Protein backbone atom coordinates (compact mmCIF):
# COMPACT_ATOMS: atom_id res chain seq x y z
CA UNK A 1 0.00 0.00 0.00
CA UNK A 2 1.28 3.45 -0.90
CA UNK A 3 2.48 5.79 1.85
CA UNK A 4 2.40 9.57 2.16
CA UNK A 5 3.90 12.19 4.40
CA UNK A 6 1.20 14.76 5.14
CA UNK A 7 2.34 18.11 6.52
CA UNK A 8 -0.21 19.75 8.81
CA UNK A 9 0.67 23.43 9.10
CA UNK A 10 -0.56 25.64 11.89
CA UNK A 11 -2.72 28.57 10.85
CA UNK A 12 -1.51 31.74 12.58
CA UNK A 13 -4.08 33.05 15.06
CA UNK A 14 -5.66 36.54 15.17
CA UNK A 15 -3.69 37.56 18.31
CA UNK A 16 -0.23 37.01 16.78
CA UNK A 17 2.07 39.53 18.49
CA UNK A 18 5.69 39.91 19.55
CA UNK A 19 5.91 39.36 23.29
CA UNK A 20 9.41 37.87 23.61
CA UNK A 21 8.06 35.01 25.71
CA UNK A 22 10.49 32.27 24.73
CA UNK A 23 13.74 32.45 26.73
CA UNK A 24 16.36 30.52 24.77
CA UNK A 25 14.82 31.51 21.43
CA UNK A 26 16.90 34.50 20.38
CA UNK A 27 14.64 35.75 17.57
CA UNK A 28 11.68 35.79 19.95
CA UNK A 29 13.61 37.83 22.54
CA UNK A 30 15.12 40.26 20.01
CA UNK A 31 11.77 41.27 18.48
CA UNK A 32 9.90 41.79 21.74
CA UNK A 33 7.27 44.58 21.59
CA UNK A 34 7.59 45.12 17.83
CA UNK A 35 4.33 45.76 15.95
CA UNK A 36 2.97 42.57 14.37
CA UNK A 37 0.73 41.99 11.37
CA UNK A 38 -1.55 38.99 12.06
CA UNK A 39 -3.20 39.20 8.64
CA UNK A 40 0.14 39.04 6.82
CA UNK A 41 1.38 36.25 9.10
CA UNK A 42 -1.66 34.08 8.32
CA UNK A 43 -1.39 34.76 4.59
CA UNK A 44 2.34 33.95 4.52
CA UNK A 45 1.57 30.59 6.11
CA UNK A 46 -1.29 29.89 3.72
CA UNK A 47 0.90 30.69 0.71
CA UNK A 48 3.46 28.11 1.82
CA UNK A 49 0.74 25.50 2.37
CA UNK A 50 -0.77 26.11 -1.07
CA UNK A 51 2.61 26.12 -2.82
CA UNK A 52 3.49 22.72 -1.35
CA UNK A 53 0.06 21.33 -2.24
CA UNK A 54 0.62 22.59 -5.79
CA UNK A 55 3.94 20.69 -5.86
CA UNK A 56 1.93 17.49 -5.33
CA UNK A 57 2.46 17.24 -1.56
CA UNK A 58 -0.32 16.23 0.81
CA UNK A 59 -0.96 19.32 2.92
CA UNK A 60 -3.31 19.87 5.84
CA UNK A 61 -4.29 22.78 8.09
CA UNK A 62 -4.37 22.85 11.90
CA UNK A 63 -6.60 25.49 13.49
CA UNK A 64 -5.27 28.15 15.88
CA UNK A 65 -6.26 28.08 19.54
CA UNK A 66 -8.61 30.37 21.44
CA UNK A 67 -6.73 33.46 22.65
CA UNK A 68 -6.78 35.29 24.99
CA UNK A 69 -7.19 32.13 27.06
CA UNK A 70 -9.92 33.32 29.42
CA UNK A 71 -10.27 30.00 31.32
CA UNK A 72 -6.67 30.27 32.57
CA UNK A 73 -7.13 33.94 33.48
CA UNK A 74 -10.10 32.87 35.63
CA UNK A 75 -7.98 30.13 37.26
CA UNK A 76 -5.51 32.86 38.16
CA UNK A 77 -8.11 34.90 40.00
CA UNK A 78 -9.57 37.36 37.49
CA UNK A 79 -13.37 37.57 37.73
CA UNK A 80 -16.48 38.98 36.05
CA UNK A 81 -17.64 38.49 32.49
CA UNK A 82 -15.05 37.59 29.87
CA UNK A 83 -14.41 41.19 28.80
CA UNK A 84 -13.91 42.23 32.45
CA UNK A 85 -11.50 39.35 33.00
CA UNK A 86 -9.33 40.51 30.07
CA UNK A 87 -9.50 44.17 31.18
CA UNK A 88 -8.43 43.26 34.73
CA UNK A 89 -5.53 41.20 33.42
CA UNK A 90 -4.30 44.13 31.33
CA UNK A 91 -4.58 46.48 34.30
CA UNK A 92 -2.85 44.29 36.88
CA UNK A 93 -0.58 42.04 34.81
CA UNK A 94 -0.21 42.99 31.12
CA UNK A 95 2.65 40.48 30.80
CA UNK A 96 0.33 37.69 31.90
CA UNK A 97 -2.33 38.77 29.40
CA UNK A 98 0.30 38.84 26.67
CA UNK A 99 1.42 35.35 27.59
CA UNK A 100 -2.16 34.03 27.51
CA UNK A 101 -2.78 35.75 24.16
CA UNK A 102 0.19 34.16 22.38
CA UNK A 103 -0.43 32.67 18.93
CA UNK A 104 2.30 30.08 19.62
CA UNK A 105 0.07 27.10 18.65
CA UNK A 106 0.91 28.07 15.04
CA UNK A 107 4.18 26.15 15.55
CA UNK A 108 2.66 22.72 15.19
CA UNK A 109 6.04 20.95 15.22
CA UNK A 110 5.50 21.29 18.98
CA UNK A 111 1.87 20.15 18.92
CA UNK A 112 2.52 16.44 19.30
CA UNK A 113 4.74 13.47 18.57
CA UNK A 114 3.33 11.17 15.89
CA UNK A 115 4.29 7.55 15.19
CA UNK A 116 2.98 5.87 12.03
CA UNK A 117 1.22 2.53 12.02
CA UNK A 118 4.16 0.80 10.31
CA UNK A 119 6.27 1.38 13.44
CA UNK A 120 3.66 0.65 16.13
CA UNK A 121 2.98 -2.86 17.46
CA UNK A 122 -0.80 -2.39 17.18
CA UNK A 123 -0.46 -1.07 13.59
CA UNK A 124 -2.24 2.20 14.36
CA UNK A 125 -1.06 5.81 14.12
CA UNK A 126 -0.27 7.18 17.60
CA UNK A 127 -0.48 10.83 18.70
CA UNK A 128 0.72 12.29 22.01
CA UNK A 129 0.09 16.00 22.49
CA UNK A 130 3.18 17.75 23.89
CA UNK A 131 2.95 19.14 27.42
CA UNK A 132 5.31 22.05 26.58
CA UNK A 133 5.83 22.65 30.27
CA UNK A 134 9.04 24.64 29.91
CA UNK A 135 7.08 27.79 28.95
CA UNK A 136 3.86 28.84 30.70
CA UNK A 137 2.29 30.31 27.55
CA UNK A 138 2.70 26.98 25.76
CA UNK A 139 1.84 24.70 28.67
CA UNK A 140 -1.87 25.48 28.17
CA UNK A 141 -1.93 24.16 24.58
CA UNK A 142 -2.19 20.39 25.03
CA UNK A 143 -5.94 20.18 25.73
CA UNK A 144 -7.03 22.08 22.61
CA UNK A 145 -4.32 20.40 20.53
CA UNK A 146 -5.75 17.01 21.50
CA UNK A 147 -9.30 18.13 20.68
CA UNK A 148 -8.24 19.39 17.24
CA UNK A 149 -6.23 16.25 16.44
CA UNK A 150 -9.12 14.02 17.50
CA UNK A 151 -11.48 16.00 15.25
CA UNK A 152 -9.16 15.37 12.29
CA UNK A 153 -8.03 11.79 13.03
CA UNK A 154 -11.28 10.33 14.38
CA UNK A 155 -11.37 6.69 13.34
CA UNK A 156 -10.26 4.55 16.29
CA UNK A 157 -9.46 1.64 13.99
CA UNK A 158 -6.59 3.69 12.60
CA UNK A 159 -5.73 6.41 15.15
CA UNK A 160 -4.85 6.42 18.87
CA UNK A 161 -4.68 9.63 20.95
CA UNK A 162 -2.74 9.75 24.21
CA UNK A 163 -2.92 12.33 26.97
CA UNK A 164 0.00 14.71 27.30
CA UNK A 165 2.69 13.54 29.73
CA UNK A 166 2.55 14.79 33.35
CA UNK A 167 3.18 18.54 33.69
CA UNK A 168 6.49 18.30 35.54
CA UNK A 169 10.07 19.05 34.49
CA UNK A 170 11.01 15.35 34.58
CA UNK A 171 8.73 14.76 31.57
CA UNK A 172 9.34 17.98 29.64
CA UNK A 173 8.12 17.25 26.11
CA UNK A 174 8.28 19.58 23.10
CA UNK A 175 6.78 17.25 20.52
CA UNK A 176 7.95 16.54 16.99
CA UNK A 177 10.52 19.37 17.04
CA UNK A 178 12.78 16.87 18.85
CA UNK A 179 11.81 13.79 16.86
CA UNK A 180 12.98 12.51 13.49
CA UNK A 181 11.89 9.44 11.58
CA UNK A 182 14.24 7.83 9.07
CA UNK A 183 13.36 5.13 6.54
CA UNK A 184 12.24 4.52 2.99
CA UNK A 185 8.64 4.46 1.80
CA UNK A 186 6.40 6.29 4.27
CA UNK A 187 4.11 3.24 4.58
CA UNK A 188 6.96 0.92 5.61
CA UNK A 189 8.74 0.48 8.93
CA UNK A 190 11.18 3.24 9.86
CA UNK A 191 13.67 4.12 12.57
CA UNK A 192 12.49 6.75 15.04
CA UNK A 193 15.14 9.08 16.46
CA UNK A 194 14.23 10.88 19.68
CA UNK A 195 16.50 13.81 20.57
CA UNK A 196 16.68 15.08 24.13
CA UNK A 197 18.54 17.90 25.88
CA UNK A 198 18.94 16.44 29.34
CA UNK A 199 18.32 13.37 31.47
CA UNK A 200 16.84 14.25 34.87
CA UNK A 201 17.40 10.86 36.49
CA UNK A 202 21.10 10.91 35.59
CA UNK A 203 22.48 14.24 36.74
CA UNK A 204 26.03 13.24 35.87
CA UNK A 205 25.46 13.82 32.16
CA UNK A 206 26.45 17.14 30.55
CA UNK A 207 23.74 19.74 30.01
CA UNK A 208 23.41 23.34 28.84
CA UNK A 209 24.43 26.16 31.20
CA UNK A 210 22.91 29.28 29.64
CA UNK A 211 19.55 28.19 28.25
CA UNK A 212 17.18 25.43 29.39
CA UNK A 213 17.03 22.01 27.77
CA UNK A 214 13.33 21.65 27.04
CA UNK A 215 13.16 17.94 26.14
CA UNK A 216 14.06 15.18 28.59
CA UNK A 217 15.10 11.65 27.80
CA UNK A 218 12.50 10.45 30.29
CA UNK A 219 9.74 12.11 28.21
CA UNK A 220 11.05 10.64 24.95
CA UNK A 221 11.21 7.14 26.44
CA UNK A 222 7.66 7.45 27.80
CA UNK A 223 6.35 8.42 24.35
CA UNK A 224 8.16 5.50 22.73
CA UNK A 225 6.42 3.18 25.21
CA UNK A 226 3.00 4.79 24.70
CA UNK A 227 3.38 4.48 20.93
CA UNK A 228 4.34 0.81 21.28
CA UNK A 229 7.58 1.18 19.36
CA UNK A 230 10.10 -1.61 18.90
CA UNK A 231 13.41 -0.94 20.71
CA UNK A 232 15.22 -2.47 17.74
CA UNK A 233 14.06 0.44 15.58
CA UNK A 234 14.22 3.30 18.09
CA UNK A 235 17.20 5.54 18.91
CA UNK A 236 17.67 8.11 21.70
CA UNK A 237 20.30 10.78 21.04
CA UNK A 238 21.38 13.72 23.17
CA UNK A 239 21.58 17.12 21.53
CA UNK A 240 24.89 18.91 21.98
CA UNK A 241 24.40 21.11 25.09
CA UNK A 242 26.80 23.71 23.67
CA UNK A 243 24.47 24.45 20.75
CA UNK A 244 21.46 24.74 23.09
CA UNK A 245 23.43 27.52 24.78
CA UNK A 246 23.86 29.15 21.35
CA UNK A 247 20.10 29.36 20.83
CA UNK A 248 19.28 25.89 19.45
CA UNK A 249 16.25 25.47 21.68
CA UNK A 250 14.80 22.53 19.67
CA UNK A 251 16.56 19.92 17.56
CA UNK A 252 14.74 21.17 14.46
CA UNK A 253 16.92 24.31 14.63
CA UNK A 254 20.07 22.22 14.01
CA UNK A 255 18.86 19.09 12.10
CA UNK A 256 16.04 17.88 9.84
CA UNK A 257 15.29 14.48 8.30
CA UNK A 258 13.36 12.97 5.42
CA UNK A 259 13.33 9.27 4.52
CA UNK A 260 16.99 8.12 4.46
CA UNK A 261 18.43 11.64 4.81
CA UNK A 262 19.52 13.48 7.96
CA UNK A 263 20.62 17.05 7.18
CA UNK A 264 22.45 18.41 10.21
CA UNK A 265 25.19 20.67 11.52
CA UNK A 266 28.59 19.28 12.45
CA UNK A 267 27.94 20.13 16.12
CA UNK A 268 24.29 19.03 16.33
CA UNK A 269 24.61 15.99 18.59
CA UNK A 270 26.62 14.80 21.58
CA UNK A 271 28.73 11.70 20.81
CA UNK A 272 27.65 12.07 17.19
CA UNK A 273 29.76 9.23 15.73
CA UNK A 274 28.40 6.73 18.25
CA UNK A 275 24.81 7.88 17.67
CA UNK A 276 25.16 7.64 13.90
CA UNK A 277 26.64 4.15 14.13
CA UNK A 278 23.51 3.02 16.00
CA UNK A 279 21.23 4.74 13.47
CA UNK A 280 23.14 3.18 10.56
CA UNK A 281 22.89 -0.31 12.09
CA UNK A 282 19.15 0.03 12.76
CA UNK A 283 18.51 1.43 9.28
CA UNK A 284 20.38 -1.54 7.80
CA UNK A 285 18.08 -3.88 9.75
CA UNK A 286 15.11 -2.53 7.76
CA UNK A 287 17.05 -2.66 4.48
CA UNK A 288 17.74 1.07 4.17
CA UNK A 289 20.89 3.16 3.87
CA UNK A 290 21.48 6.11 6.21
CA UNK A 291 22.56 9.28 4.42
CA UNK A 292 24.09 11.95 6.64
CA UNK A 293 24.52 15.40 5.07
CA UNK A 294 26.75 17.19 7.57
CA UNK A 295 27.27 20.95 7.31
CA UNK A 296 30.74 21.84 8.62
CA UNK A 297 31.25 24.77 11.00
CA UNK A 298 33.74 26.32 8.56
CA UNK A 299 30.95 26.64 5.96
CA UNK A 300 28.02 27.62 8.22
CA UNK A 301 28.50 28.60 11.86
CA UNK A 302 25.98 27.63 14.52
CA UNK A 303 25.18 31.34 14.92
CA UNK A 304 24.37 31.65 11.21
CA UNK A 305 22.31 28.45 11.32
CA UNK A 306 20.24 29.90 14.18
CA UNK A 307 19.89 33.35 12.60
CA UNK A 308 18.76 31.99 9.22
CA UNK A 309 16.96 28.82 10.36
CA UNK A 310 18.82 26.82 7.71
CA UNK A 311 17.93 23.57 9.50
CA UNK A 312 14.42 24.68 10.45
CA UNK A 313 13.64 23.77 6.87
CA UNK A 314 11.50 21.09 5.28
CA UNK A 315 12.90 18.33 3.10
CA UNK A 316 10.15 17.01 0.86
CA UNK A 317 10.12 14.06 -1.52
CA UNK A 318 8.55 15.20 -4.78
CA UNK A 319 6.32 12.96 -6.92
CA UNK A 320 9.31 12.51 -9.29
CA UNK A 321 11.33 10.99 -6.41
CA UNK A 322 13.77 13.87 -5.94
CA UNK A 323 13.97 15.93 -2.77
CA UNK A 324 13.40 19.67 -2.36
CA UNK A 325 14.56 21.68 0.64
CA UNK A 326 12.18 24.47 1.72
CA UNK A 327 13.99 27.33 3.47
CA UNK A 328 13.00 30.78 4.75
CA UNK A 329 13.99 33.97 2.92
CA UNK A 330 16.57 34.64 5.66
CA UNK A 331 18.62 31.69 4.36
CA UNK A 332 18.87 33.32 0.93
CA UNK A 333 19.93 36.64 2.47
CA UNK A 334 22.94 35.10 4.24
CA UNK A 335 25.89 34.69 1.85
CA UNK A 336 27.48 31.71 3.64
CA UNK A 337 24.21 29.80 3.99
CA UNK A 338 23.06 30.47 0.44
CA UNK A 339 26.47 29.48 -0.95
CA UNK A 340 26.38 26.20 0.98
CA UNK A 341 22.83 25.38 -0.14
CA UNK A 342 23.68 25.92 -3.79
CA UNK A 343 26.80 23.79 -3.46
CA UNK A 344 24.86 21.05 -1.65
CA UNK A 345 22.34 20.51 -4.44
CA UNK A 346 25.28 19.87 -6.80
CA UNK A 347 26.91 17.29 -4.47
CA UNK A 348 24.91 14.30 -5.68
CA UNK A 349 22.86 13.99 -2.48
CA UNK A 350 19.12 13.21 -2.74
CA UNK A 351 18.38 16.94 -2.17
CA UNK A 352 18.56 18.55 -5.60
CA UNK A 353 16.30 21.63 -5.43
CA UNK A 354 15.67 24.65 -3.18
CA UNK A 355 12.42 26.53 -2.55
CA UNK A 356 12.41 29.83 -0.64
CA UNK A 357 9.42 31.29 1.24
CA UNK A 358 8.92 34.58 3.03
CA UNK A 359 7.71 33.71 6.53
CA UNK A 360 9.03 36.86 8.19
CA UNK A 361 6.16 37.32 10.65
CA UNK A 362 6.72 33.83 12.06
CA UNK A 363 10.52 34.09 11.82
CA UNK A 364 10.58 37.25 13.95
CA UNK A 365 8.86 35.28 16.69
CA UNK A 366 11.37 32.47 16.33
CA UNK A 367 9.65 29.94 14.04
CA UNK A 368 10.66 28.88 10.52
CA UNK A 369 9.15 26.50 7.93
CA UNK A 370 9.67 23.35 10.03
CA UNK A 371 8.21 24.94 13.19
CA UNK A 372 4.96 25.56 11.33
CA UNK A 373 4.32 21.93 10.39
CA UNK A 374 3.50 18.59 12.00
CA UNK A 375 4.48 15.60 9.86
CA UNK A 376 2.10 12.63 9.78
CA UNK A 377 3.05 9.53 7.77
CA UNK A 378 -0.06 7.70 6.55
CA UNK A 379 -0.91 4.84 4.24
CA UNK A 380 -3.70 5.18 1.68
CA UNK A 381 -6.41 3.74 3.95
CA UNK A 382 -5.45 6.06 6.82
CA UNK A 383 -5.32 9.09 4.54
CA UNK A 384 -8.86 8.31 3.41
CA UNK A 385 -9.93 8.27 7.08
CA UNK A 386 -8.65 11.83 7.71
CA UNK A 387 -11.23 14.63 7.95
CA UNK A 388 -11.11 15.81 4.29
CA UNK A 389 -12.11 19.39 5.11
CA UNK A 390 -8.66 20.17 6.53
CA UNK A 391 -6.74 19.13 3.40
CA UNK A 392 -5.46 22.02 1.29
CA UNK A 393 -6.87 22.56 -2.22
CA UNK A 394 -7.80 25.55 -4.39
CA UNK A 395 -11.19 26.00 -2.73
CA UNK A 396 -9.90 25.80 0.85
CA UNK A 397 -7.06 28.21 0.04
CA UNK A 398 -9.53 30.75 -1.33
CA UNK A 399 -11.97 30.25 1.56
CA UNK A 400 -9.27 30.65 4.23
CA UNK A 401 -7.83 33.77 2.58
CA UNK A 402 -11.29 35.32 2.55
CA UNK A 403 -11.73 34.29 6.19
CA UNK A 404 -8.44 35.98 7.12
CA UNK A 405 -9.41 39.16 5.22
CA UNK A 406 -12.72 39.26 7.06
CA UNK A 407 -11.46 38.67 10.61
CA UNK A 408 -7.78 39.60 11.02
CA UNK A 409 -6.13 42.91 11.83
CA UNK A 410 -3.11 44.16 9.92
CA UNK A 411 -1.36 45.55 13.00
CA UNK A 412 -1.33 44.52 16.63
CA UNK A 413 0.54 45.94 19.61
CA UNK A 414 0.57 44.61 23.17
CA UNK A 415 -1.88 47.28 24.38
CA UNK A 416 -4.43 46.07 21.81
CA UNK A 417 -4.79 42.75 23.65
CA UNK A 418 -7.25 44.31 26.13
CA UNK A 419 -9.49 45.63 23.35
CA UNK A 420 -12.85 43.87 23.93
CA UNK A 421 -13.42 43.95 20.17
CA UNK A 422 -10.31 41.77 19.67
CA UNK A 423 -11.69 39.10 21.99
CA UNK A 424 -15.01 39.03 20.15
CA UNK A 425 -13.37 39.23 16.70
CA UNK A 426 -11.16 36.26 17.54
CA UNK A 427 -14.03 34.15 18.84
CA UNK A 428 -16.20 34.94 15.84
CA UNK A 429 -13.32 33.99 13.54
CA UNK A 430 -12.65 30.68 15.30
CA UNK A 431 -16.33 29.78 15.48
CA UNK A 432 -16.56 30.23 11.71
CA UNK A 433 -13.31 28.33 11.17
CA UNK A 434 -14.55 25.24 13.00
CA UNK A 435 -17.40 25.08 10.48
CA UNK A 436 -15.05 25.56 7.50
CA UNK A 437 -12.74 22.78 8.73
CA UNK A 438 -15.49 20.53 10.12
CA UNK A 439 -13.98 20.37 13.61
CA UNK A 440 -17.06 20.66 15.81
CA UNK A 441 -16.80 22.46 19.16
CA UNK A 442 -13.11 22.31 20.10
CA UNK A 443 -12.77 25.65 21.94
CA UNK A 444 -13.73 26.46 25.56
CA UNK A 445 -15.96 29.37 24.48
CA UNK A 446 -18.02 27.00 22.30
CA UNK A 447 -18.89 24.70 25.21
Curated annotation (Swiss-Prot):
Reactions this protein catalyses: N(2)-succinyl-L-arginine + 2 H2O + 2 H(+) = N(2)-succinyl-L-ornithine + 2 NH4(+) + CO2
Record keywords: Arginine metabolism, Hydrolase
EC numbers, comma separated: 3.5.3.23
MF terms (GO), sorted A to Z: N-succinylarginine dihydrolase activity
InterPro entries associated with the record: AstB_sf, SuccinylArg_d-Hdrlase_AstB
Pathway: Amino-acid degradation; L-arginine degradation via AST pathway; L-glutamate and succinate from L-arginine: step 2/5
Active site annotation, chain numbering: 174, 250, 371
SUPFAM superfamilies, alphabetized: Pentein
GO biological process terms, semicolon-separated: arginine catabolic process to glutamate; arginine catabolic process to succinate
Residues reported in the UniProt entry to bind substrate: 19-28, 110, 137-138, 214, 252, 365
Superkingdom to which the source organism belongs: Bacteria
Protein family: Belongs to the succinylarginine dihydrolase family.
Self-association state and partner proteins as the record states: Homodimer.
This protein's name: N-succinylarginine dihydrolase
Organism: Acinetobacter baumannii (strain ATCC 17978 / DSM 105126 / CIP 53.77 / LMG 1025 / NCDC KC755 / 5377)
Lineage: Bacteria, Pseudomonadati, Pseudomonadota, Gammaproteobacteria, Moraxellales
Amino acid sequence: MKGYEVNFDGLVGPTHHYAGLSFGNEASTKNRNNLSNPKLAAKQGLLKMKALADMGMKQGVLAPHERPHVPMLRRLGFTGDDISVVAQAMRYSPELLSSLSSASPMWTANAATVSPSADSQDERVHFTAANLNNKFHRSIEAETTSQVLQAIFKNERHFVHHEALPQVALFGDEGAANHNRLGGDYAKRGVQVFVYGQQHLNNGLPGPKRYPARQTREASEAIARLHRLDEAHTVFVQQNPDVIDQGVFHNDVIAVSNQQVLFHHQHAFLNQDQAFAEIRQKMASIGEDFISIEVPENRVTVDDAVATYLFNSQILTRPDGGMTIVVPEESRQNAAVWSYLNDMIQMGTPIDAIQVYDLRESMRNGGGPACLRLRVALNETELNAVNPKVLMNDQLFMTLNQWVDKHYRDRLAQEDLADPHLLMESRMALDELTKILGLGSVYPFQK
